[in-house]
Amino acid sequence: AAIGLARQQAHHKQASTDTISPNTLTIGLEGTFAPFSYRQDGKLTGFEVDLSTAIAKKLDLKPKYVQTKWDSLIAGLGSKRYDVIFNDVGVTPERQQAYRFSTPYLYAKTVLIKRKNNTQLNSLADLKGKKMAQSTTSNFGVLAKKSGAEIVAVPGMTEAMNMVTTQRAD
């Protein structure tokens, strides 16, 4: 879900006065995870880039993207580094107390990603004592830790996948 914009936009002209920079919607995202947001030929692209661009246009604002590592993405919204986050953010009670969430634009299904030959990891119960590559602020990292996993901190999905393929995480 997109989070941010603490005030409802009554009409388009008011939108530019409710943003960090006039006439601009400053958007925080990772930009490292296809098909959501990623770089292709040096240009930021993806589903969340397209969606946030369309929303900015509807508000008569110019989109400005700020790529940020996941672990500091939500904190950046709190410190007014950007107006909104478009980055498949999970809704938690703690986040709901601090931020407004849009209607979900995506329902993601969570799965364990493991090496093809790993037949031991099939459920949360199987995580006990295993090394899991996760962002330190990930909802899934918290869940894995509660299930007894050892968390190997990584900045994002690309690094997590590398840890698994190089057998530095289960």
Predicted segments, located by residue:
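Ligand-binding "clamshell"
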Residues: P93-L106
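Flexible hinge/capping segments at coil-to-helix
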Residues: R115-M132
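Short helix-initiation/N-cap motifs at beta->coil->alpha
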Residues: Y65-A75, T119, T137, V152-R168
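Extracytoplasmic small-molecule ligand-binding "clamshell" domains
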Residues: T17-D88
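Short, low-complexity disordered leader/linker segments with a strong preference
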Residues: A1-T24
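Short, well-ordered beta-strand segments
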Residues: T26-G28, I113, K131-A133
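Secondary-structure junction motif
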Residues: A133-S147
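A local structural motif
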Residues: T53, K57-V66, K128, K145-E159
